[in-house]
């Protein structure tokens, strides 16, 4: 817990230096390989770069100070899905062949 608090303080300090203010944080259940975030209403859709087994995380951000992971989806073997868009009521996500080969030993 002490390490997490130190990391959050470091992030907050870095954000303030750049003119931003940290409002909330999610570690995405330990899968921090986020590549793109799209917000629609009270939800944030996070595309993962493909280092973890995840392709998409959905967070409830109705309370920005305390975002909550609602659902996470795994990518197919040998693929990554690092982009996400929302058009109307449709979520669109890419599915690309991984260029780095099959990863079988996720942390």
Residue ranges of each PLM-predicted region?
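Feature marking well-ordered beta-strand scaffolds used for ligand recognition
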Residues: 1-107
């Amino acid at each position: 817990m002490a390490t997490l608090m130190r990391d959050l303080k470091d992030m907050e300090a870095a954000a303030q230096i750049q003119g931003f203010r940290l409002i909330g944080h999610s570690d995405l259940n330990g899968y921090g390989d986020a590549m793109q975030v799209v917000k629609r209403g009270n939800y944030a859709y996070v595309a993962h770069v493909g280092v973890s087994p995840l392709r998409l995380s959905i967070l409830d951000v109705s309370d920005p100070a305390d975002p909550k992971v609602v659902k996470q989806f795994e990518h197919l073997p040998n693929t990554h899905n690092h982009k996400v868009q929302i058009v109307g009521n449709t979520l669109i996500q890419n599915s690309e062949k991984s260029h780095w080969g099959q990863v079988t030993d996720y942390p």
